Amino acid sequence: HIHIDARDLFYKELKGMLLVGKKAEKFIYSMLPPSRETSNWCKKLPMSVESILCIKSDSDFIDLWYDSCEASRSMDKYNEARYHGMNMHARVYLGSVEFRYHSGTNNPIKIKNWMYVCQSITRTGIMLGKALCKDKSALTPFEKRLIDVYTKPYDNEYTYKDFIETLELPLEVSGYVDMRRELFKEHYIVSQSL
């Protein structure tokens, strides 16, 4: 799994990361073996976009995370709240955000590209979290797009183009994601029709 240092991130940035992660999950799972989507070790984020948007403090963030995960608030490493693709229990316990979606590998190409995706989700989430606190007149066009894309309540409004462009994935990484999605396309098409 990938851990990203989050000791200097608080509810605003973590809220942004949850919003980005919530929307990005469908494309993340589509590039991974089907077993990852059904695994108990990297479950989907359990909270809604609407509930994430209601986070107004660090305590709201903690309450939403543990309540949505139906887990107790604890410093125990093996707390049930950790078994999500984006593990925010690690932020409380270790000071990092853990990305658990990807299966284990020692393939350097997979590792490099997956790290880039995780770093991009983190960077985009931080930007979004800060943009949500700004006066609307001070927002850049990109910040406006982030707010528009990641605060819509419905998942079907988030496109693959949004995923690639808002995460600012370079051609090499987006090509890798395309290749992985093609590899698991048959499963993805079937699971979308169920």
Q: Which residues fall in each region the model found?
A:
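C-terminal accessory/tail domains of diverse enzymes
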Residues: 7-194
